[in-house]
Regions:
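C-terminal cap of metal-dependent C-N hydrolases
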Residues: 342-346, 401-467
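His/Asp/Glu-enriched, well-ordered alpha-helical/loop segment
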Residues: 223-249, 300, 321, 326-328, ...
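N-terminal metal-binding scaffold of metallo-dependent hydrolase/deaminase domains
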Residues: 1-42
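Short, small/polar residue-rich loop motifs at catalytic or cofactor-binding pockets
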Residues: 16-18, 47, 437-439
Length: 474
């Protein structure tokens, strides 16, 4: 169904909330006018067959932009779930096959996306699993392929993907010259290895690592996992990444920050005048804490970095409120990787995230309202800032003339309970199942097409497109 006008709602524009009507033409926003003015009065809303969508009593938000997903291969289930949850643009990391180079994975994944299959629009980040073998020429091809960013891992030596500090600096220098943003997974792998080898348990854990929860109640495997990836291993790697970026004169994007100390590192860097620092948190670190590791189902919540103490959760929300945190991603992982067996028991985890592409925006809107966080701040961290960081603004992440008509109609007085299947994301399990949310997403538009109505997909054509970042190939 083509929508050519959205009327009667409170529109969250780049300048703030406004009672206004939107005119849509050719999949983009043609005009924003005063509520009840000429847009609402005009019966010819932008073209034949277009219908008016009444948003009375609702907020009209830009479609969500999820900056952090692991979807490849097979994007349909997760993008369908994302759409049902109000996300219209998903940015996914590449997924190399066995023996495939990082560059070949990007080009193959791009080809898959260009053939269609996604419900939302979707862009790519180039994950670098072989940092020693990728050079300037390959990075230039990454840029031309439409990726706005590469991702470096300071962890996972057991998988052979860890990047040294020297190589991180060298890649940052190269990326700077190409206009590529460098994303970094910040954990100090040698420290993790030492803690794993020691078999550190709760009774010997240093107090400085944080211990607000009663760790004696933790499931043994989860306790070992959390104790061998304490906040210090993240915070040290954050400081090291910020130093490397400063010396390289490069922009950096810190993925899934989870601790109070990491948030403070970002504040300190900005106070020193360091520019081009982007800080991300993920839904699970905002909504869940490490008391989940006390349950019989503790393994469901194993994620890197692990869930933290309640004090860390509060610090993340403070960073979200004061602008230290720029973006909120889901870190959606389409396949629950190995979290059992000898390696998991030794403290290793290969789950990059938790299934959450669908619940991300409903959870964030609900929790933010409960904390008194303005809805325009939610729109900024869930849509505008991710679009800006990765070269998709203002086509995405904004409700303004010329922007894509990616729109969410959100009823703040509605209520919903999150489904157990994660909005049908294909994983068959959601750690957010049964959580009640304040507010309800009534409708979702992608480029002016109604794709979700009251939680139900209305368009089975899989209309999503591959989305190259600005400066990449069209």
């Amino acid at each position: 169904m083509t929508i050519s006008a959205v009327t009667g709602g409170t529109v969250i524009t780049p300048g703030g909330p406004a009672r206004a009507d939107l005119l849509i033409d050719g999949g983009t926003i043609a005009a924003i006018g005063d509520e009840g003015g000429t847009i609402a009065a005009n019966e010819d809303h932008g073209g034949p067959g277009g219908q008016r969508l009444d948003a009375s009593g609702c907020y009209v938000l830009p479609g969500g932009v999820d900056p952090h997903c692991h979807l490849m291969p097979g994007v349909h289930p997760a993008t369908a779930a994302a759409a049902r949850g109000g996300t219209t643009t998903v940015l996914s990391f590449t997924g190399p096959a066995a023996g495939e180079s990082d560059l070949d994975a990007l080009l193959r994944n791009r080809g898959e996306l260009e053939r269609g299959g996604a419900v939302t629009d979707i862009g790519l980040h180039a994950a670098i699993y072989d940092p020693e073998r990728i050079g300037y020429d390959e990075l230039a091809t990454v840029k031309r392929a439409g990726a706005a960013a590469i991702k470096i891992f300071l962890a996972y030596p057991e998988l052979g993907i860890m990047c040294s500090t020297r190589r991180l600096y060298e890649l940052m220098r190269a990326a700077r010259g190409l206009g590529l943003l460098v994303q970094v997974h910040c954990e100090n792998a040698p420290l993790i290895e030492a803690l794993v080898e020691e078999g550190l348990h709760a009774e010997t854990r240093p107090a400085s690592a944080g211990g607000g929860a009663d760790r004696e109640l933790f499931h043994p495997g989860a306790r070992i996992f959390a104790d061998t990836r304490p906040p210090e291993v993240e915070e040290e790697a954050v400081a090291r990444t910020l130093a490397a970026a400063s010396l390289a004169g490069a922009d950096c994007y810190l993925v899934h920050l989870s601790s109070a100390g990491s948030v403070e590192q970002v504040r300190l860097a900005r106070r020193r005048g360091q520019r081009g620092v982007f800080a991300e948190v993920c839904t699970h670190h905002l909504l869940l804490d490490n008391t989940r590791y006390a349950g019989a189902d503790a393994e469901r919540y194993l994620v890197c970095p692990p869930l933290r103490d309640r004090s860390d959760v509060e610090a993340l929300w403070e960073g979200l409120a004061d602008g230290t945190i720029d973006t909120v991603g889901s870190d959606h992982c389409q396949v629950k990787s190995a979290t059992t067996g000898p390696l998991a028991e030794a403290g290793h985890c290969y789950t990059y995230g938790l299934a959450g592409a669908g619940p991300r925006l409903p959870l964030l809107l609900s929790a933010a309202a409960a904390r008194g966080l303005p809805i325009e701040r939610v729109a900024r961290v869930a849509a505008e800032n991710p679009a800006r960081a990765f070269g998709h603004y203002p086509a995405k992440g904004a409700l303004a003339p010329g922007s894509d008509a990616d729109i969410v109609i959100f009823d703040p007085d509605g209520e919903a309970v999150l489904p157990g299947d994660g909005f049908g994301d294909g994983t068959g399990d959601s750690v957010y199942a049964g959580l009640a949310t304040r507010g309800r997403i009534r409708a979702v538009l992608l480029r002016g097409q109604l794709i979700v109505s009251d939680g139900v997909l209305t368009d089975d054509r899989r209309p999503g497109r591959y989305l190259p970042a600005a400066g990449g190939a069209a």
